[in-house]
């Protein structure tokens, strides 16, 4: 059976619907950076998702290629994630989607090296006749965070975020959003196929001791 990061690391991907504190270790991702409203039909965000999945599945299917990755094991491609911010705003202003800046990411298995990533970019570029130069290898250690499972529409996230911040303060922490520590979302549902009120999204905010 394929290794499923969501099931093997439930503390990071399947938190409860009440806030909790978690320390997230360093992970490797593939990433595309961009800006603008993620709901724009032909916008940067939609293009970024296509690029990410192109590389993610090239790496997953490398077992069928001449390029064999050392330590490879079969796995389920982890869910899409995003780091979000807006200049001049602490946190997120959901009414100003056009001002979003983001890093869209998908986690990589630890066995994927820089050489393997570079091979995947070359392979996907040749096979799909598409420019994958915006995709980068993105190692990131998130550290101490408060997180919660949000069930519902993306625009209803502020209520969950408020609950997270109250929990954080009650337990002696303060928000630590900076230019390197950002609002983080993990998308466990496909927004194209799931009703807004049933969407499952992990929301995570960086914190520090007050």
Regions found by a protein language model. Name each.
Residues 1-210:
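A solvent-exposed interaction/effector surface
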